[in-house]
């Protein structure tokens, strides 16, 4: 089972090439971020033509609140949309239950807002995701998307969050307080805790970092690049977290998508080999945004 998560940057002219590149990977499930209203129908139709006949979207929800971008999930197997999470912008997390041949599982597609524009809304989004998913689930789960975090990771496995600053001697310390553009102020401790709660804390609830499970910390993959002051700095902002029962076999980034100018993000791709067929579970569902 092949899952690809990708921030497509709301592109319109590049969409045919984005779709072509994605379909060459032959995914079973696709989770897209930054899909806009003018492209969602084209995305759904194109994915359906390649066998991903079941889809759900949050663009309609975004537009209802005067916002532009949302999420799209497309699947080879039937899906049922789950209730919205309690986050500041509901369209930023789209959740479905997938009726796959080897058993049902949940897929949660997230796009955590960046801090430059949205400030503490980013932290509240992390907190909302953790509150929803920090529980023992009756079915396996996958959480994927663009999290705009962390700042960096170190070879020893330690994480540097955006709630920390790196001193000249290399030490990462939590900063004191910060006010965003809206004038909202809070502590670095809260920020640091919120990022860690999802990026590492959900492993306690069977949502394990698939990339690190497959590659360890000797490999430093990147999915987004900052360029300025004569240098380029890569960040691993896009992630897939998954239940152990789904048995991740490989997980890698696809930097050629970025190199070819298709988006400012590289997709992350994971292949799973679930060993045992399971019973399709029961879930509460809203049915909104579902299409077959």
Tell me what each language-model feature is.
Residues 111, 119, 134, 140, ...:
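Extended recognition/assembly regions associated with phosphoester-bond processing machinery
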Residues 35-120:
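Structured beta-strand-rich core segments of catalytic domains in phosphoester-bond hydrolases
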Residues 1-50, 63-71, 276-292:
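N-terminal, active-site-proximal structural segment of metallo-dependent hydrolase catalytic domains
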Residues 66-81, 201-205, 228-248, 272-273:
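Conserved beta strand-loop-helix elements of the APE1-like EEP
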Residues 127-233, 237, 286-289:
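Metal-dependent phosphoesterases centered on the DNase I-like endonuclease/exonuclease/phosphatase
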Residues 111-124, 181-187:
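Surface-exposed cleft-lining segments at the edges of enzyme active sites
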Residues 9, 36, 78, 111-113, ...:
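Catalytic metal-binding/acid-base residues of hydrolase active sites
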Residues 2-8, 18, 22-41, 96, ...:
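Active-site beta-strand/loop signature of hydrolases that rely on acidic residues for catalysis
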């Amino acid at each position: 089972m092949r899952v690809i998560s990708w921030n497509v940057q709301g592109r319109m002219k590049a969409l045919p090439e984005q779709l072509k590149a994605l379909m060459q990977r032959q995914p079973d499930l696709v989770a897209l971020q930054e899909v806009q209203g003018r492209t969602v129908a084209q995305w759904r139709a194109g994915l359906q033509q390649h066998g991903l006949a079941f889809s759900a979207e949050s663009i309609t929800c975004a537009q209802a609140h005067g916002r532009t971008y949302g999420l799209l999930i497309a699947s080879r197997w039937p899906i049922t949309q789950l209730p919205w999470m309690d986050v500041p912008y509901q369209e930023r997390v789209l959740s479905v239950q997938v009726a796959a041949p080897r058993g049902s599982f949940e897929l949660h597609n997230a796009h955590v807002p960046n801090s430059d524009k949205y400030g503490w809304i980013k932290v509240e989004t992390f907190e909302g995701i953790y509150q929803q998913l920090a529980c023992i689930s009756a079915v396996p789960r996958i959480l994927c998307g663009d999290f705009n975090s962390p700042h960096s990771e170190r070879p020893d496995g330690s994480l540097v969050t955006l709630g920390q600053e790196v001193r000249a001697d290399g030490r990462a310390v939590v900063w004191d307080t910060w006010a965003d553009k809206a004038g909202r102020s809070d502590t670095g401790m809260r920020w640091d805790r919120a990022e860690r709660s999802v990026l590492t804390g959900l492993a306690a609830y069977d949502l394990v970092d698939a990339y690190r499970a497959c590659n360890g910390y000797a490999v430093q993959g990147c999915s987004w690049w900052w360029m300025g002051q004569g240098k380029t700095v890569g960040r691993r902002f896009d992630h897939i977290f998954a239940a152990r029962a789904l048995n991740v076999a490989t997980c890698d980034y696809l930097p050629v998508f970025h190199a070819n100018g298709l988006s400012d993000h590289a997709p992350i791709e994971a292949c799973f080999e679930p060993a045992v067929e399971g019973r399709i579970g029961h879930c509460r569902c809203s049915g909104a945004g579902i299409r077959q």
